[in-house]
């Protein structure tokens, strides 16, 4: 950051456990990917190769190499895991992640009918070899709207006890599922119940694919909240929100 002596919120430095920003790659061209990473690497902690895009990305290994050059971790979207599970090919998913040198994997049940206990069993199995990011919440807005705070808390705790390093709260890349309503509003009662529980908020990652959601979580939890599904073009814009350098969070 270019420092000209402004008093700003204190941000954690890389490698960081809190205040993480996780970008989502939806299949960007290689040169755009490289330029975006090089220009904002100080503010990017992870890149997720969204849903099953990694299977179609011809320059995947070069993208991964670019991330490693900038000390940025990567993982594949949880929907890819679910696709392998749906075809009873979990061992092939393991081989896929091993082949590409994954340190982290995402395990979810946002699309596939799978109980949280079943998901937790996969977390326990994979956590022996990988750092697991689990995901809680349905991608279906109608199903998600019926999930109570009690269920959210139960599933988060169950995933953590099974071995999840961190738990991601679903919001989709559209911000219209999981912890968000179909209209895109955060269900802040659930967030409040999580905050007031014994769950370590630093072990949670909130999907926030747009400025409204990013602003809401920063104002509710603070500048060092973990945020995911950030579009590539928002990496620096998000950091300005965290630092109160944008009108929306000016008075942090």
UniProtKB/Swiss-Prot annotation:
Pfam families: ComA
Top EC class, one word: lyase
GO MF, any single term: phosphosulfolactate synthase activity
Record-listed E.C. numbers: 4.4.1.19
InterPro entries: Aldolase_TIM, ComA_synth, ComA_synth_sf
Alphabetically ordered keywords of this record: Lyase
Reactions mediated catalytically: (2R)-O-phospho-3-sulfolactate = phosphoenolpyruvate + sulfite + H(+)
Family membership noted in the UniProt record: Belongs to the phosphosulfolactate synthase family.
Function, in words: Catalyzes the addition of sulfite to phosphoenolpyruvate (PEP) to yield (2R)-phospho-3-sulfolactate (PSL). Is probably involved in the biosynthesis of L-sulfolactate, which is a major constituent of sporulating cells and mature spores.
Protein name: Phosphosulfolactate synthase
Source organism of the structure: Bacillus subtilis (strain 168)
């Amino acid at each position: 950051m270019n420092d000209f002596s402004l008093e700003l919120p204190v941000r954690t430095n890389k490698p960081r456990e809190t205040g993480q920003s996780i970008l989502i790659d939806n299949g960007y061209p290689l040169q755009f990917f490289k330029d975006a990473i090089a220009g904002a690497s100080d503010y990017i902690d992870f890149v997720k190769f969204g849903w099953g895009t990694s299977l179609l990305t011809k320059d995947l290994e070069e993208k991964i190499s670019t991330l490693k050059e900038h000390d940025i971790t990567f993982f594949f979207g949880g929907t890819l895991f679910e696709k392998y599970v749906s075809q009873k090919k979990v061992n092939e998913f393991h081989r896929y992640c091993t082949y590409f040198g994954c340190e982290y994997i995402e395990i979810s049940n946002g699309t596939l009918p799978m109980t949280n206990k079943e998901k937790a069993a996969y977390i326990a199995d994979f956590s022996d070899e990988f750092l697991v990011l689990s995901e809680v919440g349905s991608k279906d807005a109608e199903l998600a709207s019926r999930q109570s705070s009690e269920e959210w808390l139960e599933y988060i705790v169950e995933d953590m006890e099974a071995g999840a390093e961190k738990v991601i709260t679903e919001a989709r890349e559209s911000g219209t599922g999981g912890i968000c309503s179909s209209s895109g509003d955060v269900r802040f009662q659930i967030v409040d119940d999580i905050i007031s529980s014994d769950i370590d908020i630093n072990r949670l990652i909130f999907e926030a694919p747009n400025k409204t959601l990013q602003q809401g979580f920063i104002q509710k939890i603070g500048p060092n909240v973990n945020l995911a599904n950030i579009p590539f073009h928002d990496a620096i814009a998000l950091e300005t929100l965290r630092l109160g350098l944008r009108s929306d969070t000016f008075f942090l």
